[in-house]
Swiss-Prot record:
Region (DNA-binding): 1-83
One of the Pfam families matching this protein, by short name: FUR
Gene: fur
Zinc is among the record's keywords: yes
PANTHER family the UniProt entry points to: FERRIC UPTAKE REGULATION PROTEIN, ZINC UPTAKE REGULATION PROTEIN
Main location class: cytoplasm
Assembly notes: Homodimer.
Protein's recorded name: Ferric uptake regulation protein
Length: 136
């Protein structure tokens, strides 16, 4: 079972709630899920896992490096599996939809700006807020 190995590799004990939450994150077409969305998906699949447990598991996953937490406009947190590849986000301010993108020109400019300021960049995040085509 792949989920079990991922949990072991992250130093986490294998529990049914952890496996189920990890499966929801892996199977979701939407790569950015709130704790509430994970909870709803668990309920829809007939799993008896409480919302507090979902929050706790997601926090443990974040600490173990399995997921990244993003706090977008509006103050809600969403989680995505850590894929190891950097990307930035387009965020719809009306519906909350999040779209990932990679732009090498933007990446190069950010590095150049940091170097020009003699700043050792360790990480960065770019979130562009606007209105998606479906909400326009």
């Amino acid at each position: 079972m792949e989920e079990s190995q991922q949990l072991k590799d992250a130093g986490l004990k294998i529990t049914l709630p952890r496996i189920k939450v990890l499966q929801i994150l892996e199977q979701s077409r939407n790569h950015h899920l709130s704790a509430e969305a994970v909870y709803k998906a668990l309920l829809e699949s007939g799993e008896d896992v409480g919302l507090a447990t979902v929050y706790r598991v997601l926090t443990q996953f974040e600490a173990a490096g399995l997921v990244s937490r993003h706090n977008f406009e509006g103050g809600h947190s969403v989680f995505e599996l850590s894929q190891g590849e950097h990307h930035d986000h387009l965020v719809c301010v009306k519906c909350g939809r999040v779209e990932e993108f990679v732009d090498e020109i933007i990446e190069q400019r950010q590095k150049a700006i940091a170097e020009r300021a003699h700043f050792k960049m360790t990480d960065h995040a770019l979130n562009i807020y606007g209105i998606c085509p479906q909400c326009q």
